[in-house]
């Protein structure tokens, strides 16, 4: 799409916009490699300008000072809550009704162009006569219109120093139209929009005002956000119009759902960016996986950020919510783990293990040597660390019960001969070591399967370990031979 990537911290909610919360945003974006093209804008720092815009709207007649008391506003909040509760009850009744069962809607449908008001009717009758939930909702809102301040026409304040808010003079007629680039055209009757508060009684701008002013001043052309903000577009468009500004294009992306099809929440696992990092995912894997949620570029390839940017098209984003698939995410992460630079993976591996134990220089060197071999077997950094822990075990290794059962006298004799055979190996590299093991098995007149389990137990103590040739190379000649000698 081109354009510039601007970072704005919307911190008008001062209670929630703590330094820790803001630092977490910066930290997460930096980890993902999302660096803004300009200096970060902090919304609250522009509050004085936002207040100036509110005053300009008053001068234009598109905003006004409102002196409603808290008691009056509480009554209106209760009215809105009552509407929501009635709608909830209607939805619940319709969801659980059998086709031939009478349904008491408890809603006055007078004036809806239907034949009559309805009391107890069956679900089939209701559908056949055109009664839908949308119609019921529309009727409830007709009976309970959006909030309109009694001061919108300029009534005098109740006292000379009465506190006031500044409100938008919401349009009364027509529809507010949002030609959404993903959801299609969304029309909301203007009468459903409240006289929104723009400045609170303490003089602080609200989010609704601040975001519109900042979008205009920053030259924002496209607002791409979650579809939980779809109704906010209908509230923000009139504010743009109130200042004579052209609204940006809106694109409301469906929210991500969990594997169970429900809206993503804490019960589905990690949510904050740092939690995904702590679970062992790479930033490039998160970028690639999240980019593809809901976006269908026409193929199933795993894309890097650099590959995806020129292909991205809002028209290819579906309206249905995408589901988070942890197995797919792990597969994508494994792909990027295998491609990652060896030195980087080694540093990440050392850092992951040092979360739970201290390492000396020799142990770090062992992990650095092992990382290129292990990285192709692990799906996350946590898996990588788990697979590497056998390398750090202190000698002599404490064998688990299964490993102990393999240490028969005849096997120990064979193990001694294997020790001498490997000690003579000139090249300590996994392919050469794998060949040496096969040659030894042939020399002993047995299959490799009669040597492998016991050798793996000797090298790891019974902990999971990779291919034997790789395990020997990772441990290094001295450590590997010493572990074998300990069990002879």
Where in the sequence are the language-model features?
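Histidine-anchored nucleotide/phosphate-binding helix
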Residues: 1-3
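Basic, alpha-helical terminal appendages of large translation-related enzymes
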Residues: 6-8, 16-19, 23-26, 32-41, ...
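Short glycine-centered, acidic/aromatic-flanked micro-motifs in structured strand/loop junctions
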Residues: 9-11, 225
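Flexible loop/turn segments at secondary-structure boundaries
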Residues: 14-16, 50, 257-263
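Residues on a specific face of well-ordered alpha-helices
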Residues: 23, 27, 234-238, 284, ...
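Short alpha-helical basic/polar micro-motif
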Residues: 55, 213, 221, 234, ...
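Active-site cores that bind ATP or allylic diphosphates and position pyrophosphate for catalysis
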Residues: 65, 71-252, 257-264, 272, ...
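Catalytic adenosine-cofactor/nucleotide-binding cores of aminoacyl-tRNA synthetases and other
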Residues: 231, 243-398, 404-405, 460-488
């Amino acid at each position: 799409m081109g354009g510039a990537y601007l970072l704005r911290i919307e911190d008008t909610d001062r209670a929630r916009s703590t330094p820790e919360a803001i630092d977490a945003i910066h930290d997460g974006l930096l980890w993902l490699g999302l660096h803004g093209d300009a200096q970060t804008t902090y919304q609250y720092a522009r509050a004085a300008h936002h207040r100036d815009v509110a005053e300009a709207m008053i001068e234009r007649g598109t905003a006004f000072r409102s002196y409603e008391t808290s008691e009056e506003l509480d009554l209106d909040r209760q009215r809105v809550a009552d509407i929501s509760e009635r709608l909830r009850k209607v939805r619940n009744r319709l969801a659980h009704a059998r086709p031939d069962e009478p349904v008491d809607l408890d809603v006055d449908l007078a004036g809806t162009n239907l034949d009559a008001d309805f009391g107890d009717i069956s679900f089939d009758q209701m559908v056949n006569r055109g009664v839908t939930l949308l119609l019921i909702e529309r009727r409830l809102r007709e009976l309970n219109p959006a909030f309109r301040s009694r001061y919108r026409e300029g009534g005098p304040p109740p006292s000379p120093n009465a506190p006031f808010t500044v409100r938008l003079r919401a349009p009364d007629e027509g529809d507010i139209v949002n030609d959404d680039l993903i959801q299609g055209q969304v029309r909301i009757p203007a009468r459903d929009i409240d006289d929104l508060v723009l400045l609170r009684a303490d003089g602080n701008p609200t989010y609704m005002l601040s975001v519109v002013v900042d979008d205009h001043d920053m030259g924002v052309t496209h607002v791409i956000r979650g579809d939980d903000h779809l109704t906010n577009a209908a509230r923000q468009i009139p504010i743009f119009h109130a200042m004579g500004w052209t609204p940006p294009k809106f694109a409301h992306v469906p929210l991500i759902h969990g594997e169970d099809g429900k809206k993503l929440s804490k019960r589905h696992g990690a949510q904050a960016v740092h939690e995904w990092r702590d679970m062992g995912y790479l930033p490039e894997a998160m970028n690639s996986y999240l980019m593809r949620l809901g976006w269908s570029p026409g193929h199933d390839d795993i894309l890097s950020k650099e590959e995806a940017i020129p292909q991205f098209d809002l028209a290819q984003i579906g309206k249905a919510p995408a589901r988070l698939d942890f197995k797919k995410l792990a597969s994508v992460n494994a792909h990027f783990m295998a491609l990652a630079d060896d030195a980087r993976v080694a540093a990440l591996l050392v850092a992951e293990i040092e979360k739970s134990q201290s390492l000396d220089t020799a142990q770090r060197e062992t992990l650095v040597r092992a990382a290129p071999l292990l990285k192709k077997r692990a799906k996350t950094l946590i898996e990588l660390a788990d697979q590497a822990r056998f390398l750090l075990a202190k000698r002599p290794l404490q064998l688990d019960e299964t490993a102990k059962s393999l240490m028969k006298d005849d096997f120990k004799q064979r193990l001694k001969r294997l020790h001498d055979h490997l000690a003579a190996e000139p090249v300590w590299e996994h392919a050469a070591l794998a060949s040496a093991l096969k040659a030894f098995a042939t020399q002993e007149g047995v299959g490799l399967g009669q040597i492998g389990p016991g050798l793996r137990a000797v090298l790891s103590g019974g902990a999971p370990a990779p291919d034997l040739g790789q395990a020997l190379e990772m441990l290094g000649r001295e450590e590997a031979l010493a572990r074998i000698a300990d069990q002879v």
